[in-house]
Regions:
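Ser/Thr-centered flexible coil motifs
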Residues: 10, 40, 202-204
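Charged, often Cys/His-bearing segments associated with DNA-binding zinc-finger transcription factors
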Residues: 1-35, 263
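Short, charged/polar micro-motifs that form catalytic or ligand-binding hotspots
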Residues: 37, 51, 62
């Protein structure tokens, strides 16, 4: 069976993930007696991954798997933190990223991962995008290789501030320079020139900015690839308290999908 379109994983990766989840369970997924679960572990893990990949409603996923929305809700609540845990080793830490980027030029970009407007969490409002969400920082090499993805910060956090708070600035210190967009001015990254107040950019400034943009294209592709996990691209709808586990699980699946089986 092909899993890539629904979960982002190839067959062997899904098999490996199920094996890891099974080993991490406190007790067998299906009891030896009593009523069996409506989905076996393989199908349940697939449903949880489908939720992260597609950000579809639980009712829709239940229909696809011939089970109920409450069942998908329960399985998602149990399995998403497990997916995060068993794949954590594939997510590069800042220290791992420093080893990769030493002496090499890096590309940095920030992205907003949108979520519902939780009334009690006004810090998630992002003025630039005029919506609520979280700020994540991504670093790639010039060839687009994913070096690091930060954890999420509140959506109100400006990229320049997030660059420092997430540890991306420490990674830059060990790199051989880096490029960012206008939101990173003053961080040590090479950035495009802003239009002066009441003036216009010169032709040479426009050409310079165009070159910066072309250099940054690989990290923008990385952002797009990362956000193929639709829970990072469209509004996250589950309770606020579950967001960080879901983000971490999606991030882990992203790195797992581009590394495991390709050594």
């Amino acid at each position: 069976m092909c899993y890539y379109r629904t979960t982002g994983l190839i067959v062997t990766q899904m098999q490996e993930l199920v094996r890891r989840v099974n080993n991490a369970l406190d007790k067998p997924w299906n009891k030896h007696s009593g009523r069996p679960k409506s989905l076996g572990l393989h199908k349940a893990v697939e449903a949880a991954c489908m939720y992260l990949r597609q950000n579809a409603t639980q009712e829709f996923i239940g229909d696809c798997r011939d089970t109920s929305q409450p069942t998908i809700s329960r399985y998602t609540a149990v399995l998403v933190p497990l997916v995060k845990s068993v794949l954590e080793e594939f997510v590069p830490s800042a220290a791992d990223a420093i080893e990769v980027v030493k002496g090499r030029v890096i590309l940095v970009d920030g992205t907003l991962t949108p979520c519902w407007s939780y009334e009690e969490h006004q810090e998630l409002w992002n003025k630039k995008h005029k919506t609520t969400g979280y700020n994540a920082q991504l670093i790639s090499l010039l060839d687009g290789t994913a070096a690091w993805v930060s954890g999420p910060l509140a959506g109100k956090t400006h990229d320049a501030k997030a660059f420092k708070e997430t540890g991306a600035a420490d990674i830059l210190k060990e790199a051989g320079g880096g490029f960012g967009d206008k939101g990173y001015q003053g961080t040590g990254l090479v950035t495009p020139k802003k239009k002066p107040i009441g003036g216009e950019l010169t032709l040479s400034d426009k050409e310079y900015n165009s070159q910066i943009s072309s250099f940054r294209a690989p990290v923008e592709r990385l952002v797009a690839h990362f956000k193929n996990w639709k829970m990072l691209h469209t509004d996250y709808r589950r309770p606020y308290s579950t967001y960080h586990d879901a983000f971490d699980a999606a991030r882990a699946l992203f790195f797992f999908s581009i590394t495991w089986g390709f050594e």
